Amino acid sequence: NARTLLVAGDPANGGGRQRGFAAGAGAIDAAGTESGTRERLGDYYLYPLAARTTIADAQQKQVSFLDVQGTPARATYEYVNGWLGSSAEPMSASSVLKFSTSRQGGLGDQLPAGTIRVYMRDARGDPQFIGENRIDHTPMGSSMALRTGEAFDVKVRPTVEQRTRKGADRWETRMRYTLTNARPEAVTVDLAQLGLWGDTRVVQQSLEGRRVSAERMEWSVPVAANGS
């Protein structure tokens, strides 16, 4: 019959900076800047559980501290390729769930660090576990990209086709990305290429992409059902 209060934050313990959880693999796409109504204590956020709970000796128990329904979320596929990344065989794309913690069109709350488990209802209406990932303490207004696993029927094969020296420290590299889809419906794969840095230019591309940072280029690649 205990009252429970969850405190979210990263306190120092005298032995250097410590983290209770490492951030998930790219869980926060963009950090939010919104303020909510949660009670704060210094740099910490407090999450009191609404009802008392009883926990037996050595028992593990799940309790709810956030109940939001109808929040929009989008399931996508993603593949991130490192600089000069080339694979002899096709690699599985990541299954990614994207959502927002913003007040408008999102969860409308800050999230404490921990593991998020994702369930999806099957054809019979039964919830089935489809993956999990850890997140760091997340401010409200953030854009989240939660990787829940790999899609073995959506593949990407990056290939370095040619690399030519153009000067003492200048190179021209030609890349090819081959995407295949063994699913009965069309999909879109968010393809990212890392390692471009500030002096790298993309001079030719078969699909228009976007430079999202100094070292990252992204393309949204539509792949037909049972096609490539």
Model-derived features: where do they sit?
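Long, intrinsically disordered, low-complexity accessory segments associated with secretion
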Residues: 1-228
